[in-house]
C-alpha cells in the first residue's frame, strides 16, 4: 500500500482530518526516503467506545500511505493513572483491549497482518527502560510533569507520584518503540511537547506528533468512558444505540459540539467517501453526500433535519458495530468482558454517608423546577426555520424567553395562549443566538411520521403553579441544574405517557394541586 502515491500524496493522506501536526517538515523529508514509522497508544482503562473509530480510521489512512504502524496497549500507564485499571485486572483488561481494538480494525477493513501490536510491560520493565525513567526524573521538574499530564491523567486533590511519572514513560515509549512519530488526540498535546523538550536531554531524537481532534460526546462535551450518557459502547445493542442517539445533542442548524455530525466527518466519510442521509420521500427522499463540507452546509441551513441525520448515523454505525457484537457474543468473549469489568453494568455512585449495600442512588425528581407556564406570544426564530421563540409567563415579574423546535409539529396558533409545562431550572442556553430560559416539555412518538404534542396542565392551573411527581411533593428544586450531573437526562429516560394519557415518571403521575398533567393523544410516548 502507498506504492502508487507520491511523498506529497502520502503526507496529505497522513494529515487529513488532523487538528495539528508538530514536525511536518521533518515528516515530509522522511517520506521522500522511506516509510514513516508511527505508533498509537491506548491505556487499557475503561471500555473503548465508538469515538475510538476516529483513531482507527486514521490508522487505516496511515497504512494506505505505506506507513509502518505500531499499536501499543499501555497497560502500565493504565495502572499509573490513579489505578484506573487495578493491578489484579490489568492482564484481563489488556486482553479485552487487544480483542476489541482488533475487532474494530477488522470491521473497517484494516489488515491486521500489516500492524505491529505490543504491550507496554513487554519493554517498560526492562533494566534499560527503568534506568531511563530514573535519568528522566533527574531532569524533569515536578511542575512540568504535572502540567504535561493535566489533560490526560486524572486530576485529584492530592496527586499520586505515579501520575507524575506517566508523561515521562509516554515520552520514552517513542524511543523504545523506534518510531518517527506518535499519533494521538489533541488532548495529548502537552505530553507531546513535554517529550519534544525532554527526550533530547537524554540524547534521544525529537519525534513528530500527529493529533486528531476530540469528537464531542452525545451530550456535547468530550466523549468519555467514565460518563455513560456521553458515549455509545462498542457492544451496545441496536436498541441502545437508537436510544442514545435519540437523546444526543444535535440542535437544528448548530454544528458546534455536535457529536453526531463530528462522527460523520471523522469516521464515516474517511471510511466510505460518501454518506447517505435517509429521508422520507415526501421530504425529498434519500440524499447522497460525497464530501462533508456540503453536508455541514446543508445542516447549517437546516436542509438536513437532526432526526434524519441521527437515523442515518444509526444505520451506518450499526453496520460497523455488528461484526464486533458478533465476535463478543461467544461464551469466551462474554467471560472476558465480565471478568475484565466485573459488575460494570451494576456500578453506581454510593451517596455520601450511605453504605455499599444501600442500593443504587436514585435521583430525586423534585430537583426539577417544573411549573405551569402560559404562552403570551410566539414568533419564528429569525435565524432558524424550525424554531419558535416564545414569551412564557411562569409567575415571575417578567415572562421568560423560551426557544423550542416545534415549528414542524405544532402550528403557532395552537401555542398562543396555551398553558404548558416548563422546566425552569436548566442552565440558560443560546440557540442560534437567542438565549432560551427554559424547556417546554412535550410528548412525542417515533414512526413514519414523528408526532409531538405539548403536555397539558390541569384546566384552571395558574402560571407559576408548581408541578411535582406523585410522592415527591415535599422536595425542593435545585436553583440551577448543574450540566455535568445530568439530572434531567437521567430522569427523562423514565418519562412516559400512560395508557390513560397521564404524564408519568416510573409510573408516578406529574401532578399539580388540581390534578394530573396529561397529553391529548400520544399513548406510550416519551417526554422531552
UniProtKB/Swiss-Prot annotation:
Record protein name field: Tyrosine--tRNA ligase, cytoplasmic
Disordered, as annotated region: 335-364
SUPFAM superfamilies from the UniProt entry: Nucleic acid-binding proteins (SSF50249), Nucleotidylyl transferase (SSF52374)
Localisation: Cytoplasm; Nucleus
Catalytic activity from the UniProt record: tRNA(Tyr) + L-tyrosine + ATP = L-tyrosyl-tRNA(Tyr) + AMP + diphosphate + H(+)
Keyword list, A-Z: Aminoacyl-tRNA synthetase, ATP-binding, Cytoplasm, Ligase, Nucleotide-binding, Nucleus, Protein biosynthesis, RNA-binding, tRNA-binding
PANTHER family: TRNA-AMINOACYLATION COFACTOR ARC1 FAMILY MEMBER (PTHR11586), TYROSINE--TRNA LIGASE, CYTOPLASMIC (PTHR11586:SF43)
Notes on the domains: The nuclear localization signal, which mediates localization to the nucleus, is also important for interacting with tRNA(Tyr), suggesting that it is sterically blocked when tRNA(Tyr) is bound.
Biased composition annotated in UniProt, kind: Polar residues: 346-358
GO molecular function: ATP binding; tRNA binding; tyrosine-tRNA ligase activity
Motif annotated as 'KMSKS' region, chain positions: 222-226
Family: Belongs to the class-I aminoacyl-tRNA synthetase family.
UniProt xrefs under Pfam families: tRNA-synt_1b, tRNA_bind
A biological process from GO: tyrosyl-tRNA aminoacylation
Sequence positions that bind L-tyrosine: 39, 166, 170, 173, 188
Limits of the tRNA-binding domain: 364-468
Record-linked CDD domains: tRNA_bind_EMAP-II_like, TyrRS_core
Short motif 'HIGH' region, span: 44-52
Motif placement: Nuclear localization signal: 242-247
Origin superkingdom: Eukaryota
EC number: 6.1.1.1
Disulfide bonding pattern of the chain: none
Organism: Xenopus tropicalis
Gene Ontology CC terms, in alphabetical order: cytoplasm; nucleus
Amino acid at each position: 500500500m502507498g506504492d502508487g502515491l507520491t511523498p506529497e500524496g502520502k503526507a496529505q493522506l497522513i494529515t487529513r482530518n488532523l487538528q495539528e501536526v508538530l514536525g511536518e517538515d521533518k515528516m515530509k523529508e522522511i517520506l521522500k526516503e522511506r516509510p514513516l514509522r508511527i505508533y498509537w497508544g491506548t491505556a487499557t482503562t475503561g471500555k473503548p467506545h465508538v469515538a475510538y473509530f476516529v483513531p482507527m480510521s486514521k490508522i487505516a489512512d496511515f497504512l494506505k500511505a505505506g506507513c509502518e504502524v505500531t499499536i501499543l496497549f499501555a497497560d502500565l500507564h493504565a495502572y499509573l493513572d490513579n489505578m484506573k485499571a487495578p493491578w489484579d485486572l490489568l492482564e484481563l483488561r489488556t486482553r479485552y483491549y487487544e480483542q476489541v481494538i482488533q475487532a474494530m480494525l477488522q470491521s473497517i477493513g484494516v489488515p491486521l497482518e500489516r500492524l505491529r501490536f505490543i504491550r507496554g510491560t513487554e519493554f517498560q520493565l526492562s533494566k534499560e527502560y527503568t534506568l531511563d525513567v530514573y535519568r528522566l526524573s533527574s531532569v524533569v521538574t515536578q511542575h512540568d510533569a504535572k502540567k504535561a499530564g493535566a489533560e490526560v491523567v486524572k486530576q485529584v486533590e492530592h496527586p499520586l507520584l505515579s501520575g507524575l511519572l506517566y508523561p515521562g514513560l509516554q515520552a520514552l515509549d517513542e524511543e523504545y518503540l523506534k518510531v518517527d512519530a506518535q499519533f494521538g488526540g489533541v488532548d495529548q498535546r502537552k505530553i507531546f511537547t513535554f517529550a519534544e523538550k525532554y527526550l533530547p536531554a537524554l540524547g534521544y531524537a525529537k519525534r513528530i506528533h500527529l493529533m486528531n481532534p476530540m469528537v464531542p460526546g452525545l451530550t456535547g462535551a468530550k466523549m468519555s468512558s467514565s460518563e455513560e450518557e456521553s458515549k455509545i459502547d462498542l457492544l451496545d445493542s441496536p436498541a441502545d444505540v437508537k436510544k442514545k442517539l435519540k437523546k444526543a445533542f444535535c440542535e437544528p442548524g448548530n454544528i458546534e459540539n455536535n457529536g453526531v455530525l463530528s462522527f460523520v466527518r471523522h469516521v464515516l466519510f474517511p471510511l466510505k467517501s460518501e454518506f447517505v442521509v435517509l429521508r422520507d420521500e415526501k421530504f425529498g427522499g434519500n440524499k447522497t453526500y460525497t464530501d462533508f463540507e456540503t453536508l455541514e452546509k446543508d445542516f447549517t441551513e437546516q436542509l438536513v433535519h437532526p432526526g434524519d441525520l441521527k437515523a442515518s448515523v444509526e444505520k451506518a454505525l450499526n453496520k460497523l458495530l455488528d461484526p464486533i457484537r458478533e465476535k463478543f457474543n461467544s461464551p469466551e468473549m462474554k467471560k472476558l468482558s465480565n471478568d475484565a469489568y466485573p459488575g460494570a453494568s451494576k456500578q453506581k455512585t454510593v451517596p455520601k454517608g450511605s453504605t455499599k449495600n444501600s442500593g443504587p442512588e436514585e435521583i430525586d425528581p423534585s430537583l426539577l423546577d417544573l411549573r405551569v407556564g402560559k404562552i403570551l406570544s410566539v414568533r419564528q426564530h429569525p435565524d432558524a426555520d424550525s424554531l419558535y421563540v416564545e414569551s412564557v409567563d411562569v409567575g415571575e415579574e417578567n415572562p421568560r424567553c423560551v426557544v423550542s423546535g416545534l415549528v414542524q409539529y405544532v402550528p403557532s396558533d395552537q401555542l398562543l395562549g396555551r398553558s404548558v409545562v416548563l422546566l425552569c431550572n436548566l442552565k440558560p442556553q443560546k440557540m442560534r443566538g437567542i438565549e432560551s430560559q427554559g424547556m417546554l416539555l412535550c410528548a412525542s412518538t417515533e414512526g413514519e411520521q414523528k408526532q409531538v404534542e405539548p403536555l397539558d396542565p390541569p384546566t384552571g392551573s395558574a402560571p407559576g403553579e408548581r408541578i411535582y411527581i406523585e410522592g415527591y411533593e415535599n422536595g425542593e428544586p435545585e436553583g440551577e441544574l448543574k450540566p455535568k450531573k445530568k439530572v434531567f437526562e437521567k430522569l427523562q429516560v423514565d418519562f412516559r405517557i400512560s395508557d390513560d394519557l397521564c404524564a408519568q415518571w416510573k409510573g408516578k403521575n406529574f401532578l399539580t394541586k388540581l390534578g394530573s398533567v396529561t397529553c391529548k393523544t400520544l399513548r406510550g410516548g416519551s417526554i422531552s
